[in-house]
Amino acid sequence: ETMFVFIPLAHRLGLYGIKSEMEDIWLRYKEPEAFHEITAKINRNVIDKDKEINDFIAPIDKALVDAGFRFEIKKRVKTPYSIWKKMNTKRIDFDQIYDLYAVRIIFEPDENTKETERDQCYHIFSIITGMYRYKSDRVRDWVNYPKNNGYEALHCTLMSKTGIWIEVQIRSRRM
């Protein structure tokens, strides 16, 4: 009932935090071993990587300020349910999940420039890929080709200076 009624309802209403929480609760009760194993791996990784992620973000923050962008940067760790679903759907191991950590760059479009909102996404992409190596097969362009649900963003996966893959999602506040 939760999986087929309440989770889709929360998603449709835009209650993404509640949706994620219900998915994790569902996983904890339906697949307790998988839930505990994934949660333990997340906890080990997050404690070790939090400083590295902040160190990854700092130069991006500075470069975007220097380029004149108005923005905020948020970070997130993928939820246990999302990890479990990806592992099962793609038949991959935990270590093959490249978007365990994600950084969202949400910018305010500059109306005083000739660059369109889309161009500004690519400008940010150009700045950050000039700083970090990116995984070319992990670039997702949902700015030029929005998802069926209307989602727009530019995703790429970058290698930090310490060797961890971090997904970066670039979008305007409107997107």
Model-predicted segments: where are they?
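Nucleic-acid processing machinery
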Residues: 1-175
